[in-house]
Amino acid sequence: MTWRDEIARRVRGEHLRDAPLAPRTAVRVGGPADLLCRPADGDALSALLRAVRELGVPLSVLGGGANTLVADAGVRGVVLRLPQEFPGESTDGGTLVLSAGAPISRLPARAHAHGLVGMEFLGGIPGTLGGAAAMNAGTRLGEMKDVVTRLELATPDGTGFVPASALGYAYRTCRLPPGAVIARVEVRLHAGDVAASEALMREDRERRRATQPLDRPTFGSTFTNPPGEYAGRLVEAVGLKGHRVGNAIWSPVHANFVTNLGGATARDVLALVRLARARVKERFGIALETEVRLMGEFLDEDLEGLDGHAAAGGGPGAASGGVRPPEAT
């Protein structure tokens, strides 16, 4: 019995072998996963975490695929993708408990259905709630740390809620315990003017359409903004707005967005990222930090010149998926 057979036997849920990942990411780049798993519930998620630990199989977590770049060679081991809905979702007053796999785009409407507001900043953000909670996603209207009260974390030993105050939330990051995976997210909202909330979200969406390249595959902002600066302005200032490598390009619309013109490779994308970091560092003395999480089997030469966050696989709670399992059958 292979490790993939054993995981399928031990973990209730969906299991796809050699699953293409490019269609499951926002930038539409990357190779396949050895095994893509979608556990049926929290118990199955813990069973998966136990199985990969005992079998020595690497694990990566894929949310909605935003801010994620998958290697051209794909991802070794298991790629975990949570269901859009988990048993145990609930609404109690202004408190909502939602699956980490829930698409962000649906959440404001779900809150509005209960007369609640406070998630307007999520209206234009792609991906899943768990990914947004892990990276403290946000816009000019707010960020996740403003509404998250607790995260339910799954480990090989089970699941349990951890208060947000214990997770070290900061700009575009939080500190999850090693090996933990977000299963559900608890947010605290408040009653308010739903019509005004919807109008604010429409206004923000229109602004994004006018200023961001939303008509092409992109993982969103590539770099975090340095203190007192804008990464897009820096990339444009060093002459890279509209610069192309292969079929990837620094967008002519917004210079902090890499877009896929069709058939781009991860190597194309990383070449643009390395070039921008080098030029900005040389001219301004600023070391740009990526928002993009790398997943999979990258070559060492592709990772040269990247900041530690990207080269290590980025987002908390997931391995990079670049190490081969004991056998890959």
Curated annotation (Swiss-Prot):
Residues 311-320 have a biased composition (Gly residues). One of its GO terms (biological process) is peptidoglycan biosynthetic process. The active site is at 172, 221 (proton donor), 291. Residues 28-192 form the FAD-binding PCMH-type domain. It comes from the Bacteria. Residues 202-227, 307-329 are annotated as: Disordered. Its EC number is 1.3.1.98. It is found in: Cytoplasm. Pathway: Cell wall biogenesis; peptidoglycan biosynthesis. The keyword DNA repair does not apply. One of its GO terms (molecular function) is FAD binding. One of its GO terms (cellular component) is cytosol. The keyword Cell cycle applies. Cell wall formation. Belongs to the MurB family. This is UDP-N-acetylenolpyruvoylglucosamine reductase.
